[in-house]
Amino acid sequence: FSLENKYAIWQEIEVLACEAHAEMGKIGITREEAAWIREHAKFSKEEVDAIEAVTNHDVIAFLTNMGEYIDAEVPEGEPKPSRWVHYGMTSSDLGDTALCYQLVQATDIIIEDVRKLGEICRRRAFEERETLCVGRTHGIHAEPMTFGMKFGSWAWELKRDLDRLLDARKNVAFGAISGAVGTYSSIDPFVEEYVCERLGLAHDPLSTQVISRDHHAYLAGVLATTAATCDRIATEIRNLQKTDTLEAEEPFKKGQKGSSAMPHKRNPITLEKVCGLSRVVKANAQVAFDNVALWHERDISHSSAER
């Protein structure tokens, strides 16, 4: 979610849109101009920031900077290829498609991490299948069980999280380049299909000027559920690391200190961080749900929250 990555995606979307227009041959841009734009399109984050300080509009600042690079080597008096950049598009076409692409990128990372954690829990479930421990209900000793059961329970929960994440990834992998209020009055639907196909996104079958935020809210809800699983695992190990129990503990490397006042302590700080951060993820899901209800075909009340 760095600015550099966002701008790189913006650049690719704008270039692909120009190539789509050239492919159609309707608005006047030639294949040669599209190829020129592809070759010369660049941006400088610092320069974009400087322009935005004046325009107070991030998309205009980016397009201005990108256009300067595209036209820098054009001979004097020749038409400027940058005039075709962003043709018929709105800021939402660019920003929403890029955001969904970023969410896919981020979800892919999370999917791989959840897959790895699930495999670890599955492996440990078999390794510890005969390791006896105390089962507790209401925090009180109940009946004997095995550590393998704990790991197995976590493994299955992570498998369900993985299935939900894969579905949520598919649900958020959408793009929309449909112009003002989503009517395609200023841009041919072919451009949307062309750009989305090359980004690996589906094109939204009916967007307004923005991609409906139920896509994003669904992903946020799944992420909150996954965070709750991590919270559950971390909380269990924290409880088992209590001095009075000490059935399990997180790693504590050589030279690590537990307390400035009590050096004998081995605090479960990593697990506590997991529990704390899970609260942030779950709280952010509520924001995503609130972003679904926008005014008419678009407002930007969601934008500041998403940023």
Predicted feature residues:
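Amphipathic, well-packed alpha-helical segments that form the structural scaffold of globular domains
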Residues: 122, 126, 196, 200, ...
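Residues on one face of amphipathic alpha-helical coiled coils
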Residues: 116, 120-123, 160, 164-167, ...
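Short alpha-helix boundary/capping motifs
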Residues: 149, 186, 223-224, 302-303
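Buried hydrophobic packing segments
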Residues: 17-18, 103, 107, 223, ...
